[in-house]
Amino acid sequence: MNKEIFTSSLLDEQYTKYRHPSGLDIYIFPKKLTTFYAIFGVKFGAIDNCFSLKENPENIITVPDGVAHFLEHKLFANEDGSDSFERFSSLGADANAYTSFNNTAYLFSATENFYDSLRELIRFVTHPYFTEENIASEIGIIAEEINMYNDSPSDRCFYGMLEGMYEHHSIRRNICGTAKSIKKITPELMYNCYDSFYNLNNMGLFICGDVHEDEVIKIADELLPSKSTQFDIIHQSNNKKEEPQVFQTYIEARMQISKPIFNIGIKDTNIPDNSDERQKREAIYSILNEMIFSQAGELYSSLFERDLISPNLSYCYTISPTNAYNSIAGEADNPKSVLDEILKFIEDLKIKGLAYDDFIRSKRIMYADFVKSFDSTEGIANNLMSFSFDGAEILSYVDIIESITFDDVDTVFANAFDKDKITLSVIMPLDNN
């Protein structure tokens, strides 16, 4: 079994990566904290709705929206009629799962019985059980979940931003799918997706806590195959076929809210192929956002003091191999005026130039936030999965942050915030008339 140790003298942290004979990568991050945390992740998310197999690349398979999320729900069902949530609960562990655009994760946290809980995690994720009956019963449950998200102003506003930015990319579709799309899901389809994507070469096990590595590997040897099977997926989609400009510049809906909310999306099509370069771009944008949009900054003070925005203004840059965007979200009586004020501030700032002191302050904040994330087993395990699934190495991120210069940020800023790459998504209150 291949073993690789990663260390950081800056962070004084270390973890080990094992390449199990089954093809599964096992990451063990030792941490002497009271909580254990484990994630069994798979690189299968909501955007993976179109693919083919290497043995027949011309046969393109398209699956209904929401399949990855539906599969996540049903994997907890066992052939003996039990539910794995109940098994975790009996062990004193808190289990959960989630589906994102790019990945699916099955996880638990525990303060006791860690190894028994780990056995249950590996066992149920590697033993699917789908029937006509349990699929039919789940359709109604997920339809209610879809309705709940559709009734959420913040979710509607977020997806409106994505729909405005992207014309073709699967990210514009709801992770849960639609009430119509999930009705097309069958046991055969679920098994086909499971067999295609839930290959151990396409998965990872991420563990953080005060654990014994030998015991973890012993459990993996007990429950996993001794040989690897070939991973045959070829992604076939329109996810890279996007124009630089946004699809629509303005999206509006009306819902039962007291004050308008908004999401501003800035599309970024300059996506590096190299994972380290993607991580660096994410770090640069995070520093830039802190310089421009933080509560300590001139822009926020101006907007808030003139009552143009409510106190909470959030901002985030997101990047993956197939899409990237910057987003700013908040609450305002007139979101269009807020966007105009932001663009005017950006235009003036490009003439005046970024302040070096703001760069130093923002970089220190980002560095401190990253270091602080290593105080939590949950934060470590989730970040470990995120970095690893993107082909990056978590401990090297601190070196990436350290390496970023003022010129790096200034260069990105010079080409950011183009008007034709901006979408404004707004949820307005219902018209009283």
Where are the model-predicted features located?
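His/Glu-rich zincin catalytic helix
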Residues: M1-D83, Y191-S302, T423-N433
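Charge-rich, well-structured scaffold segments of protease-associated domains
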Residues: K74, N78-H235, S275-K280, N289-E290, ...
